[in-house]
Curated annotation (Swiss-Prot):
Pfam families: FBPase_2. Its EC number is 3.1.3.11. It comes from Lacticaseibacillus casei (strain BL23) (Lactobacillus casei). SUPFAM superfamilies: Metallo-dependent phosphatases (SSF56300). This is Fructose-1,6-bisphosphatase class 3. Belongs to the FBPase class 3 family. It is an enzyme of class 3 (hydrolase). It catalyses: beta-D-fructose 1,6-bisphosphate + H2O = beta-D-fructose 6-phosphate + phosphate.
Length: 643
């Protein structure tokens, strides 16, 4: 149904059409809602949740603006943490207070929350504010929000509502619901610029929290390279599965597979115990002190790590050979090993193999899987493609995600736009057609969605392209020429570890290059920005480049990367006043944050200031609303002519 048919069916009379025109044109003049951008969460749920709850520092800023000099810094901090973590903070209040002190706390807190809610709701319609409220408290909250308690006629009415909430033991529930409403209104829309998944312990909880938040369609995702592994695994790609399991073993994170998604690893564990011994190159990285393991567990993970790595290297061979268009023959590493596995020749240089584990590799046919290995990978494909929870989460990533997004003048993408040294777009030639720039992204996304829709097809081009997205030389999500996984396991010479970043990463400092990219994606080069994730911003490196047109917001949630960055990463806020880059210090733990009121210390840097406040009319939604207004005015004219 086209827009005209849809609107004329919904609004059939002159008064109805006129009312909707008045409503829409009023909305167009409201201030632009606040967007927040974050990326590279890497499964760090608690740090992600803290940023989500505090709105990238925006909640505290709202409190400060609302109450100005009425609160001490300590009082402001306590109130902010109530808004962030209402249930946990109220439990602490109940331990600390009782009787009249608790009653007074309730009365004071109710008044403060109503004031803050009113302050955060000023740039939204009543309808939108209502949708952000908990349904069970809509009536009560609206009565408190839109009534003047200082009017004598309503004063008793106002306070009776509050007293009854306390007497009927609904005060805690109302406070929690109102705090969550304030969180939702403080940031209207969240953009996740890739990599929900990776080495962190709880990517599933990150997805669940996004699903909960999305009841107002307020979340979008631009897939990252690690996300693609999980989407590919759910789609039945054996290579994506092997990579994913290997990374989980490497970072002592197999529990996410077994305990969360119900993936059966028994066949893999038996194979690993049969063929592999201890090996320092495959011992799990113990980057998290909260997940200690026994020596027996460490040995088992080390064996599993080797077994799945060998399966991965074997699976790569047939795909590379049947896809010459991928131009990845240089990654056929197993056939470059000496027959005794003591050395390997790569790019004209011979390297000594250290910590080798090639018991299942036949030098005469190095990519052939043993029957036991084939049984393992078949079992894993079966588990991944039939995990209900995994598919529910991947469905959400597919429904709300894309390879890139054009949103309110800006281009959001996780990795890069592949180019050569001169800045010319490069890509892939498939069946005689060369795809570069925006066409490359569109082609890869179309194939990803095709592969996901047919999980029983696992040797087709669409499925192979999912693996290419993870590791291919011209993959927009990888951004390097080589993924030197094999070399890092078995060769100590750092020369062999070089992966070669795409020239995009040094060219993106040039304003003209960024304008070229914006034009390629049909955005205004003069006012648009590229918002990028994927690469941690090293100490001393500026995340704002190209005369403020390129903004790198790797979230820095992953603790190992914080050694490189020195901070907890960046998020970006874009509101009616302009853009601000928010720098976060590393997050400790949720328990520490709540017990000690330890916020992530954030500093803000203005990226761009609007000459005047931007309105809804200057957003993508505003363009849609203006189209609706034009159609309604046309229909209004038609009805008046018929009178």
């Amino acid at each position: 149904m086209d827009l005209y048919s849809e609107l004329t069916a919904k609004y059939q009379t002159v008064p109805a059409i006129a009312t909707e025109i008045i409503n829409l044109e009023a909305i167009l003049n409201l201030p632009k809602p606040t967007e927040a951008f974050m990326s590279d969460i890497h499964g760090e749920y608690n740090a992600f949740q803290h940023v989500l709850r505090n709105g990238s520092g925006n909640v505290k800023s709202k409190i400060r603006s609302c109450f100005r000099d009425e609160m001490t810094e300590a009082t402001l901090q306590r109130f902010a943490f109530l808004v962030y973590y209402p249930s946990e903070r109220m439990a602490a209040i109940h331990r600390e207070m009782a009787g009249d002190d608790l009653q007074q706390w309730y009365l004071t807190t109710f008044r403060r929350l109503i004031r803050l809610l009113a302050f955060t709701a000023t740039k939204y319609t009543r309808s939108k504010v209502r949708k952000a409220m908990a349904p069970e408290f809509v009536y009560i909250t609206e009565e408190l929000l839109y009534n003047d308690a200082d009017t004598p006629d309503k004063l008793a009415y106002y306070w009776q509502i509050i007293r009854n909430l306390i007497v009927l033991e609904q005060a805690d529930q109302w406070i929690a619901a109102t705090c969550q409403t304030i969180q939702r209104l403080t940031v209207d829309h969240f953009h996740v610029v890739g990599d929900i998944y990776d080495r962190g312990p709880a990517p599933d909880q990150v997805v669940e929290s996004l699903i909960r938040r999305d009841r107002r369609h307020s979340v979008d995702i631009q897939w990252g390279n690690h996300d693609i592994l999980w989407i590919g695994a759910a789609a039945g790609s054996a290579l994506c599965i092997a990579n994913l399991v290997r990374i989980s073993a490497r970072y002592n994170n197999l529990s996410i597979l077994e305990d969360v998604y119900g993936i059966n690893l028994r066949h893999l564990a038996r194979l690993a115990e049969q063929y592999y011994q201890d090996n320092p190159a495959f011992s799990p990285k113990m980057e998290r002190s909260d997940r200690p393991i026994t020596e027996a567990e460490r040995l088992q993970i080390t064996q599993i790590h080797q077994a799945i790595a060998m399966i991965q290297f074997k699976l790569e061979g047939p795909v590379i050979k049947r896809r010459p268009e991928f131009d990845m023959d240089h990654r056929l590493v197993l056939e470059k090993l000496a027959p005794d596995f003591s050395t390997i020749k790569l790019n004209g240089d011979t390297y000594t193999i250290e910590n080798g584990c090639f018991a299942t590799v036949d030098p005469a046919d190095p990519y052939k899987l043993l029957p036991e290995e084939q049984e393992v990978i078949d079992s894993l494909v079966e588990s991944f493609t039939h995990s209900e929870k995994l598919h529910r989460h991947m469905d959400f990533l597919l429904d709300h995600g894309s390879m890139y997004l054009r949103y309110n003048r800006n281009l959001l993408l996780h990795g890069c736009v592949p180019v050569d040294e001169d800045g010319n777009f490069i890509g892939l030639t498939i069946k005689g057609t060369t795809y570069t720039g925006r066409q490359l992204f569109d082609m890869l996304e179309a194939n990803l969605r095709l592969a996901y829709s047919q999980p029983t097809e696992n040797a087709d081009l669409a499925t192979d392209l999912m693996w290419y997205l993870w590791t291919g030389p011209n993959s927009p999500l990888f951004g390097k020429h080589d993924m030197t996984t094999f070399e890092r396991y078995f060769i100590s010479d750092p020369k062999a570890h070089v992966e070669g970043r795409n020239p995009y990463y040094h060219l993106r400092k040039d304003p003209e290059f960024i304008k070229k990219i914006l034009a390629e994606f049909v955005l205004d080069p003069e006012v648009g920005h590229v918002i990028n994730g994927h690469t941690p911003v090293k100490k001393g490196t500026d995340p704002i480049m190209a005369n403020n047109k390129m903004i790198v917001i790797d979230g820095g949630f992953s603790k190992p990367y914080q050694k490189t960055t020195g901070i907890g990463g960046y998020t970006l806020l874009d509101n009616s006043y302009g853009m601000q880059l928010v720098t976060h210090q590393p997050f400790t733990t949720k328990a520490d944050a709540i017990a000690n009121l330890t916020d992530i210390i954030s500093t803000r840097r203005v990226v761009e200031t609007e000459a005047r406040r931007r309105t809804v009319a200057e957003t993508d939604i505003g363009t849609e609303l203006q189209d609706e207004v034009e159609v309604l005015k046309r229909r209004l004219g038609e009805l008046r002519e018929e009178e």
